[in-house]
A protein has these predicted regions:
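N-terminal cationic-hydrophobic initiation segments that often serve targeting/anchoring roles
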Residues: 67, 81, 107, 142-145, ...
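"Short basic amphipathic alpha-helical interaction patches in structured regions
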Residues: 35-43, 52, 92, 103-107, ...
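Interdomain helical connector at the RecA1-RecA2 junction of SF1/SF2 helicase-like NTPases
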Residues: 1-89
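Conserved RecA-like P-loop NTPase helicase motor core
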Residues: 116-206
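Generic beta-sheet signal
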Residues: 87-91, 149-152
Length: 206
């Protein structure tokens, strides 16, 4: 900005720096590679008539992978430092049934059970009262984001026109090799909202 607009105020200066990371899940979970030689989230998260995962053991292994301490790969929930960075996140999943099944599994996981799971996909979890998605997320985060931990599950809601200041990351667990980059970008910018929380300026997002 300074090179092209020297002397002019930078309108983007207050935005947190966007960091984009990718994981090669196909290298770890070979059976979910599709014809484009890319990882297929829709198949990976496929549910049966009882709304449980067809590949439940693999999904459970994936959640364990996210929380596995690995110095080389730096999985996002591998230690307390990372869990504090990703205290409030948005997870994009393929569909409503998949979100319900994942919500149930997260609530049983030894690490993720300490996060409040907010399912805003469709009408949310069956045992939860239907309400405005943004209100549900903000209530779960509460007045002090440092005192809570949340994971918001969505397959489309809250991806345009809203801002949740406490969100620091979005996990894209949907789409495929052929998904347009523009659809990803529109979603990930939800976490680039400027914020000052308990005196700390949000400088990074993921």
């Amino acid at each position: 900005w300074d090179n092209l607009h020297f002397g002019d105020p930078n309108p983007y200066a207050s935005l947190p720096t966007m960091n984009i990371y990718t994981y090669d899940l196909g290298r770890l979970l070979h059976e979910f590679i599709d014809e484009d030689v890319a990882f297929n989230f829709r198949e990976f998260f496929r549910v049966n008539d009882e709304e449980t995962f067809v590949h439940e053991k693999d999904v459970w292994a994936f959640l364990n992978l996210l929380t596995k301490e690995d110095k080389e790969s730096c999985y996002p929930f591998a230690n307390e430092e990372y869990r504090n960075i990703f205290r409030h996140t948005l997870w994009m999943v393929p569909g409503v049934k998949e979100a319900r099944a994942l919500s149930t599994m997260l609530q049983r996981h030894p690490v993720f059970q300490h996060f409040k799971i907010v399912n805003v996909a469709g009408d949310g979890d069956r045992d939860e009262e239907s309400r405005d998605a943004l209100v549900a997320v903000e209530e779960a985060i509460g007045r002090d984001p440092d005192a809570t931990r949340t994971i918001t599950l969505s397959c489309g809601r809250l991806t345009t026109g809203v801002s949740v200041k406490a969100w620091t990351a979005v996990f894209m667990l949907s789409g495929s090799y052929n998904t347009a980059a523009s659809s990803y970008m529109q979603t990930i910018f939800r976490v680039q909202t400027p914020a000052t929380i308990n005196g700390r300026v949000k400088e990074q997002c993921y």
